[in-house]
Amino acid sequence: MTIELGIAPIGWTNDDMPELGKEVTFEQAIDEMTLAGYKGTEVGNKYPKDPKTLKHFLDLRHLKIASAWFSAFLTTKPYEETEAAFIKHRDFLHAMGAKVIVVAEQGHSVQGLLDKSVFDDKPHFTDDEWERLATGLERLGDRAREVGMQIVYHHHMGTGVQTTAEIDRLMTMTDPDKVSLLFDTGHLVLSGEDPLTIFNRYQDRIKHIHFKDVRQQQADEEHKDHLSFLAGVKNGMFTVPGDGMIDFKPIWEAIQESGYDGWIIVEAEQDPAKANPFEYALKAKKYLDATMNIPQSA
């Protein structure tokens, strides 16, 4: 079992709301990731788009790229449009040495809409849309396998694959050899799901992990005030492991027992003006080191 610990840049600068962290440079973010002791990162909106340039900056800091988000529109657009964008994304990540590609369906998604409740207004796919999603993901999985990579599907708040039932349906409808799963603690808990149930059920298909924590008060407000996903982020509903309501110890024990081999990425969308990203990166690293002693490769 080889597990590497990385951190997402979304705590430094937000992809969905670029005004959050707009003053933070790419180099500041990766410098602080390195100083905090992480071995890798996912790709953010300020990262160089040229693999050679990006690799140069990361190699200086002994950082690696674990993956990067890809927005699919398989339920609402012709498959060919998604595939063309996916191939470019795949080739970039392949050049960076990543093994998995994070994919999330954005057809009908409300995650980027400030005026839509993440619970009340989330999409519910029709049977035809489910078929299009499953078939399209398997085709993308085939394209990933052409270069020795895998797609990992990201269940996400405000999308058509958020709940346990929706995750179950997607996993049932897709070939395990073509479609793997990203396990995100924060999105599961905020949605009201049991992360241990999901992990134990799909441990053989989980190929990428996000460790995100949730603040109880802000999670309650997300429901009570019918907030959007972005409003919830601004309100501070997410934080790093050890700073919220999630008990990561049993989750870590299940991960160890499963023989998981891959990345664990610390991820917490927060306003860096309110939650200093370097301080929170250190806080998460200290908590994970003290409570889980994650073994890492050299």
Swiss-Prot record:
InterPro entries per record: IolE, IolE/MocC, IolE/XylAMocC-like, Xyl_isomerase-like_sf, Xyl_isomerase-like_TIM-brl
Catalytic reaction equation(s): scyllo-inosose = 3D-3,5/4-trihydroxycyclohexane-1,2-dione + H2O
Co-factor(s): glutathione; Co(2+); Mn(2+)
Pathway: Polyol metabolism; myo-inositol degradation into acetyl-CoA; acetyl-CoA from myo-inositol: step 2/7
Keyword check for Nucleotide-binding: no
Statement: the UniProt record of this protein carries the keyword Manganese: yes
NCBIfam families reported in the protein's UniProt record: myo_inos_iolE (TIGR04379)
Family in the record: Belongs to the IolE/MocC family.
Stated name of the protein: Inosose dehydratase
Native source organism of the sequence: Lacticaseibacillus casei (Lactobacillus casei)
Higher taxonomy: Bacteria, Bacillati, Bacillota, Bacilli, Lactobacillales
